[in-house]
Amino acid sequence: MENVYENSYMIVGIFLLLGILLPVVALTLGKLLRPHKPSEAKNTTYESGIEPYHDANVRFHARYYIFALLFVIFDVETLFLYPWAVAYDKLGLFALIEMLIFVAMLLIGLAYAWKKKVLQWL
């Protein structure tokens, strides 16, 4: 039985090694084989063939980051809910209660953010 586990870890190790090695080799070969001829035109910002007329660095309001953070939180919630939903019949009532508590905590946080008017634009 130990041989099966060692073989599984070896396969994971090979995939990890290839996952790191292949992009590094491809990027290195691309850098070595491409022609290097820098020019002023190549270093300008390209906006659909039009010369840029102002600085591309624009400051975003902090509320955008709050919405992005909320999106990430609820996206991670989906990562937790999907495996639970797939294996629901094997996990039983205890896992159902745990997931309900998890979702309830997220909904309480969302209600708190809504009450504090974090989700309003103006």
From Swiss-Prot:
<dbReference type="GO" id="GO:0005886">
    <property type="term" value="C:plasma membrane"/>
</dbReference>
<dbReference type="InterPro" id="IPR000440">
    <property type="entry name" value="NADH_UbQ/plastoQ_OxRdtase_su3"/>
</dbReference>
<keyword id="KW-0520">NAD</keyword>
<keyword id="KW-0813">Transport</keyword>
<dbReference type="InterPro" id="IPR023043">
    <property type="entry name" value="NAD(P)H_OxRDtase_bac/plastid"/>
</dbReference>
<keyword id="KW-1133">Transmembrane helix</keyword>
<keyword id="KW-0874">Quinone</keyword>
<feature type="transmembrane region" description="Helical">
    <location>
        <begin position="91"/>
        <end position="111"/>
    </location>
</feature>
<protein>
    <recommendedName>
        <fullName>NADH-quinone oxidoreductase subunit A</fullName>
        <ecNumber>7.1.1.-</ecNumber>
    </recommendedName>
</protein>
<dbReference type="GO" id="GO:0050136">
    <property type="term" value="F:NADH:ubiquinone reductase (non-electrogenic) activity"/>
</dbReference>
<dbReference type="InterPro" id="IPR038430">
    <property type="entry name" value="NDAH_ubi_oxred_su3_sf"/>
</dbReference>
<dbReference type="GO" id="GO:0048038">
    <property type="term" value="F:quinone binding"/>
</dbReference>
<comment type="similarity">
    <text>Belongs to the complex I subunit 3 family.</text>
</comment>
<feature type="transmembrane region" description="Helical">
    <location>
        <begin position="66"/>
        <end position="86"/>
    </location>
</feature>
<dbReference type="Pfam" id="PF00507">
    <property type="entry name" value="Oxidored_q4"/>
</dbReference>
<comment type="function">
    <text>NDH-1 shuttles electrons from NADH, via FMN and iron-sulfur (Fe-S) centers, to quinones in the respiratory chain. The immediate electron acceptor for the enzyme in this species is believed to be a menaquinone. Couples the redox reaction to proton translocation (for every two electrons transferred, four hydrogen ions are translocated across the cytoplasmic membrane), and thus conserves the redox energy in a proton gradient.</text>
</comment>
<dbReference type="GO" id="GO:0008137">
    <property type="term" value="F:NADH dehydrogenase (ubiquinone) activity"/>
</dbReference>
<comment type="subunit">
    <text>NDH-1 is composed of 14 different subunits. Subunits NuoA, H, J, K, L, M, N constitute the membrane sector of the complex.</text>
</comment>
<keyword id="KW-1003">Cell membrane</keyword>
<keyword id="KW-0472">Membrane</keyword>
<keyword id="KW-0812">Transmembrane</keyword>
<dbReference type="GO" id="GO:0030964">
    <property type="term" value="C:NADH dehydrogenase complex"/>
</dbReference>
<feature type="transmembrane region" description="Helical">
    <location>
        <begin position="10"/>
        <end position="30"/>
    </location>
</feature>
<keyword id="KW-1278">Translocase</keyword>
